[in-house]
Amino acid sequence: MNKSFTLSALLVLFAAPAMADDLSKYQEESRTVATAFVTQLIGENKKAVMEGGPESAIKVCKEIAPKMAGDVSRKQGWKLTRVSLKVRNPLLGSADAWEQKVLMDFEKRIAKGEKPESMEFVEIVKEPAGNSFRYMKAIALQPGCVTCHGAAEQIPDAVKARLADEYPNDKATGYAPGQIRGAISIKRTL
């Protein structure tokens, strides 16, 4: 038997459990970071609404959330973003090809009855620059979020005016509570 083939086969055999352990570890770390990010974002939105009304939440999503994502990315050494198929800010929220595929898969899973609160996806992706661990956690629209992301009749006039001013090409409306608004996406180079 070819010695190099045997050595390669043994390396794969022994490396597979280690890779699975790493994948589970990365998934748990990513889940923890994504959950903390969403919890903090919801808290910031609630605080803004209490202090300045519903249109104040727009500033949270436009200015505070990207800063929070940048802070997490720098601290962890990963890239954390919020992505969607229906973006409000195409510069920050547009999904790449892999993220689009996962978001469409989330939609299929929700159609089959899976709860969005626990929906996530992980994969090791081979890219030109090397392998990356990719993680996504679905963001389900919360009841209070319809004020900015709901059907046209659910959005107050002051919020509509502010959205039209801030986001003239806004596509992030028409959602109902429980639908997937987007996802937290984490990418880390391996």
Feature map (PLM): residue ranges:
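Bacterial N-terminal signal peptides that target proteins for export
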Residues: 1-7
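Bacterial N-terminal signal peptides
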Residues: 8-15
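Sec/Tat signal peptide C-region and signal peptidase I cleavage site
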Residues: 16-20
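Extracytoplasmic c-type cytochrome modules immediately beyond a signal peptide or single-pass transmembrane anchor
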Residues: 21-142, 154-190
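Detector for the c-type heme attachment site
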Residues: 146-153
